[in-house]
Structure formats: C-alpha cells, structure tokens
Swiss-Prot record:
One Gene Ontology MF term: peptidoglycan binding
Chain spans, region Disordered: 550-576
Enzyme Commission (EC) number: 3.5.1.28
Endpoints of the signal sequence: 1-21
Matches recorded under Pfam families: Amidase_2
Similarity comment: Belongs to the N-acetylmuramoyl-L-alanine amidase 2 family.
Name the record gives this protein: N-acetylmuramoyl-L-alanine amidase
Residues reported to bind Zn(2+): H410, H522, C530
Effect of H436A: No effect on amidase activity
Site positions per UniProt: Important for catalytic activity: Y447
Disulfide-bonded cysteines: C419-C425
CDD domains, A to Z: PGRP
Length: 576
C-alpha cells in the first residue's frame, strides 16, 4: 500500500505543472496529502496507476531518466486516476512542490519542517520509493539496457552497506569500507571523449583506480546523481559549486515563498541536501523493515516529530549524524562515479557527459564527495537568523577581522532548561535578543552562535559581526553559548560535540578560525561563574583548551558582570 501511494504522489508531483497552492508549504501539509491518498486510493489500484502519473511527467531531464530506469515505470494513460484522489487544496500543494528548482534567487519544491529545516520534497519521495523497492542494484559495466526493476536484482546484504541508521554517536563518515574491484569499466564503455579536446584539456586527469562495479538505486536517485552533475558543471566552467546555501521564508506560520541568501546558489541547496539525505535515511530504513511496513504518513510524522519508533535520535534533527553513519566517503565517491557512468549509457546521453573519460568522471566524483562529506555532513546544521525570527540589528554592526584566534564558551544560565525542539529554542533566542537589546542596550543578541539540545546551532551575530559576549575580547574570538545552566549538570553529548569538534573544525576549514585557535571558558577572561562549574571542568580536558590566560583586572569589569545574574523572567544570560 505504501509503495503504491508513493507512486501516485510522485506522479502528481512530476506530472503536474507548477501552480498556486492554498495550503502553507509545510511538511505537515505533505504528510496530510499522503494520509489522504492512503485513505482514499485502493491498495490494489495504486501501484499501477501511480506509475502512469510518473511516466507522463513532461520533464525528460537526466534525473527523470534515473527515476525511470532505476525505479521503474509503466506506460498508462494518467487520466485513469480521474477523479483525482486529492482534495483541491492538496492537489494545489502537489503542484506547488512539483519539482525542485532554483530560479532568480528563489527556491521551489521545498517545505518547512517542524524542526525548522527546509526540505526539498522530490529527493525525499524518490528515496522513499527506492527503499520500498528494496534498494535495487545495477551492475557495471552494463551488459544490457534492461532496467534493474525488470531483473529483480536487490542488494544481498544491505546492512553491510548501511548499518543501523539510529547510530548517532559517530560525528563523521566511517573510514573503513569494503573494497570495490572489477574489470576496468573503460574497456566496456564506448569512448565518449572523441571530438572533445576542449573538455579533455579543461579537467585535471585522475588515474581511475577501482572503478565502480554497481549503482545503488537509493543513493543514485537521491544524492549521487545530483552531486555528480552539479560538480560536473562546475568542473567544466572552472568554478566551485556552492553547497548548502540557506534561505529565508516570507513567514514561518504559513510559509509561501523561499528566498535564497545567495541568489547565485547552485541546485545543491541546504533544502535539497536535507531532502536527499532524509530520502537516503528513510529509504534505507524501509528497505530493512519487513512487511507490514508503517504507512508513509505515519513514518514521516514520526521522523519529523519525536522520532521513528519513539527513538529521539532517529529524527530529522540529527540527519547529518545518521546519514554519516550509513556509508563511507569511498563508497559514496564510487556511487557518484557509477551514477555518472550510468547516465552516460542512458539515452539520450547527457550532453556534458558525452565527452568525459572515466578518469575525469572519477575526479568529479572525488571532488563532489569531498565537499559533501566535509562541508555538509561534517559540519553542524545552523539555523540562520531569519529562521528563529531575529529582530534587525540596532545600529551598524562592526565587522570582525578574520580569521580569529579564540573560541569563548558560555552557558546561557537563563534560560536554564535545555531546549530540545525548534519551537522552544527559537523562543529562547528571541527572548535573549530582546533582553540584550532592550535591557542591556546592545545592538543585537550578544553571542556569535547558540547551541540547542535539539541538534541545531542558532546563528546570533554569526561569523562576521563583532559580538557582545566576552568583555574586552569580543573582537578576538567567537562567543558560543549552550542553552541551559551547567553549574551542576552537563549538556547533551550532541551539543558538546558541536562545540568541541564540528563547529570549530568547519570554521577552520572555511578560514574563519585559525588552526591553532585557543578555547577558553568565559570565566577565564571575566569574573563570572560562566560557563558553569560542570561544563568548565569538562572544557579543561578538551584539546584546544588553554589554561594560561589570566582574567582581566577587577577594575575593568563592571560590578554586575562579576556574578551570575539571578533567575528572572527575561533571560539575563551572560553580561559579558
């Protein structure tokens, strides 16, 4: 039943021309559409007619060729679903999120999820369908053009490729992975580089070792194909594709328009990567779940809610940790390479692939995988200011002189309870900003970043504005606070890992923080108990902690800032 319902929704998404929806662009609306399909469409009818909707999609681009070849489709008149099983409002929604696209600084086909993240619907649904089909595999080189859904091939051991998705302890990709070896695919693939000297000269040559032997349908239709094609375009134009560009909704309660923060962003936006990774995670889960599987509406409600099967670690908040546990960089690189090889063999051949050698494809795959694993999977998810409803900066912010040499750790003290969901964390951010602006008279919230216990970092003054977090040292380092009072207790392991590992390492990689940066607790520079005894004792064991910095003389510190502020309705937080 679940697979048939998904075929119908995929067909609706791909077949319908973009229109205007009356429903807000929320993940809850997509879940509502799935629930309505599950209720109204007979299980015996769904799979056959839904694939007709997919086949009638007007877009014949390379992504649809992958969908058709790896997921399967039948030629059937799409009007057999008349009358449409969806209400006019939900049909309007499917038209609104028909296909993912980026045009003139706007992003289409995306919705706002309950965790505050923006998610592209198309790669999410493609991943769900691939998982329902059992993660089909196609062997390379192609002996025939028979689609894998016709041969019935599946992975004999999916768990060996994708371990338990709920393992959230690993911050990065596993280094160990099975070696993939086979005969050189170049011997079985037509020479696609003849007559293309310009392309041949424009790309660095890479020795093609261990060429790909198979393509995983789940990775191909979600991540691998899009990563490969986007970085292929970048390599041919001598430019580096932007990865993970964020954006802002026109409103959070009933979002309708999503504007990217970089109008020149590539298709690999944050929303697309979120949707693709969610598709991989949930597709893998479905491929390993025996019948009867949960309904898709129920599964998505759990995943974008409290957690699948009541596991709080298995939810969208922790998609990067869970996604990183599913594969290794070497396997993903092979899948990107293999998917590009597959696209070379499908008709009509993608024009940019027509003149590419296997060595060049291998280089594109390596570059794409490195950027994805280091700049996306290996970095924390940061909600931009617009996502938590920040008020404008009062005055004119002063710019930092980057890179900086210090990272100052704080706790907010008030709010004292850790925030574990987007609604509470966003409310805490707005409350702290109001106090800092209205009571303290500062231009903005004082911290550079605030870390919640919901799996997200919240942008305060960010990487470029001087903060108001560590008196006398604001221009020398970033101030990072963890929501909560850590006098006697410690933050969650996920929050600690963010401050200790992922946030600073990504800042170093981006040239924002010096590689030899020093990490200090607030109390080392100002007479205060911040960041709390329990947290500070732990900081002293961290690699970049520096114990030799002396606190500022008492005469240069205000009386009020020498003590922790007492609890109050408005969060006092650190007073520098």
């Amino acid at each position: 039943m679940a697979q048939g319902v998904l075929w119908i929704l995929l067909g609706l998404l791909l077949w319908s021309d973009p229109g205007t929806a009356s429903l807000p662009l929320l993940m809850d609306s997509v879940i509502q559409a799935l629930a309505e399909l599950e209720q109204k469409v007979p299980a015996a009818k769904t799979r056959h007619t839904a694939s007709a909707w997919l086949m009638s999609a007007p877009n014949s681009g390379p992504h649809n060729r992958l969908y058709h070849f790896l997921l399967g489709a039948w030629s059937l008149n799409a009007t057999e679903l008349d009358p449409c099983p969806l209400s006019p409002e939900l049909l309007g929604l499917t038209k609104e999120v028909a296909r993912h696209d980026v045009r003139e600084g706007k992003e289409y086909g995306v919705v706002l999820a309950p965790d505050g993240s923006t998610v592209a619907v198309e790669p999410l649904l493609a991943g769900l369908e691939a998982g329902l089909q059992g993660r089909r595999v196609i062997n390379l080189p192609l002996d025939s053009m028979a689609a894998p859904w016709e041969t019935g091939d599946t992975f004999p051991d999916v768990v060996a490729i994708a371990p338990d998705v709920r393992a959230t302890s690993s911050p990065g990709l596993r280094d160990g992975s099975p070696d993939v070896t086979t005969a050189d695919i170049g011997a079985n693939t037509p020479d696609a580089t003849k007559g293309c000297p310009d392309v041949q000269a424009s790309l660095p040559d890479a020795k093609a070792k261990s060429p790909p032997t198979m393509v995983d349908s789940l990775l191909a239709v979600t991540l691998a194909g899009n990563l490969g094609l986007t970085f292929l375009r970048g390599s041919q134009t001598q430019s580096h594709p932007d990865l993970g560009t964020e954006g802002c909704w026109d409103q959070l309660s009933a979002p309708r328009t999503f504007t990217l923060l970089d109008p020149k962003a590539s298709l690999l936006t944050m929303a697309f990567l979120n949707g693709a990774l969610d598709g991989v995670i949930l597709g893998d889960y479905l491929s390993r779940t025996p019948e009867p599987r949960p309904s898709l509406s129920h599964l998505l409600s759990q995943y974008y809610g409290a957690g699948v099967a009541r596991d709080p670690g298995f939810r969208s908040n922790f998609r990067r940790q869970n996604g990183a546990a599913l594969t290794s960089a070497s396997i993903l690189a092979q899948q990107v390479w293999g998917t590009l090889v597959l696209l070379q063999r499908l008709e009509p051949v993608h024009l940019q692939l027509q003149c590419m050698s296997q060595e060049q494809l291998a280089q594109v795959a390596a570059n794409a995988t490195k950027e994805f694993t280091e700049a996306f999977l290996g970095c924390p998810a940061i909600h931009p200011r617009c996502r938590w409803g920040a008020a404008p900066y009062r005055g004119r912010p002063k710019l930092l002189q980057l890179p900086l040499g210090f990272l100052y750790v704080h706790h907010t003290y008030v709010p004292a309870p850790p925030c574990t969901d987007f609604t509470r964390c966003a409310a805490n951010m707005r409350s702290m900003q109001r106090y800092h602006q209205d009571t303290q008279g500062w231009g903005d919230i004082g911290y550079s970043f605030v870390v919640g216990s919901d799996g997200y970092v919240y942008e305060g003054r960010g990487w470029h504005w001087v903060g108001a977090h560590t008196l006398g040292h604001n221009s020398r380092g970033f101030g990072v606070a963890i929501v909560g009072n850590y006098t006697a207790a410690l933050p969650t392991e996920a929050a600690l890992r963010t401050v200790r590992d992922t946030l600073p390492s990504c800042a170093v990689r981006a040239g924002l923080l010096r590689p030899d940066y020093a990490l200090l607790g607030h109390r080392q520079l100002v007479r205060t108990d911040c960041p709390g005894d329990a947290l500070f004792d732990l900081l002293r064991t961290w690699p970049h902690f520096t114990a030799t910095v002396k606190p500022r003389p008492a005469r240069s510190v205000s009386k009020r800032s020498r003590r922790e502020p007492p609890p109050r309705t408005l969060p006092a937080t650190d007073l520098q």
